[in-house]
Amino acid sequence: MPADRLDGWLGRFESRHGAVRGSRQDEALTLTAADGAVARVHLPCAPSQSDRNDLVAAAAAFGSFGLVLVRRGGFAVGRVEQGSLKASRCGTRYVQGKTKAGGWSQQRFARRRANQADAVAQAAAGAVSAVLGRIATTLVCGGDRTLLRQTLELSGADGWPVVRWLDVPDPRRQVLIDAIPRARAARIDLNSAARSLGS
């Protein structure tokens, strides 16, 4: 659910199901309505309180973060400020597919594939340093988790908080732009009572 539509959705949930009581559980805010309907709202940054106004404010406030997308076919790194892409760097790299050859050929191809994947991580790490700098920032990451961990380690960003993981196709600039609203969106899980009335 886009962050700017969350307030309206919460209002409709309450009007359909009755008064709502909020409670924090893990990284989500659980909203329990009078009729037993339950909605678990997951945001990239958890609200400090458990009421509707704070939830909406927390969703709207998450607008500045680093976006790091890495897959074997390339990488895209962006700095997002107030919900807009302010700086980015993208690149593609060739990583050979798996082979069905056996013996020495298989080992040679595996080494070549590993070296090519390392080159992707090195290039992506350079982009992280260039675009995001050295000051720790909140990150949203997407793609191949092994390559992402390697990229963050190489760039010195492995200690930075990662608040969300996205599934993405091969990273390009447009994929980076399309990932911004997904990174900021609220994820809502409903129980059967909430789904039965089409919340």
Question: PLM features: residue spans?
Answer:
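Terminal alpha-helical anchor/extension segments at protein ends
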Residues: M1-S199
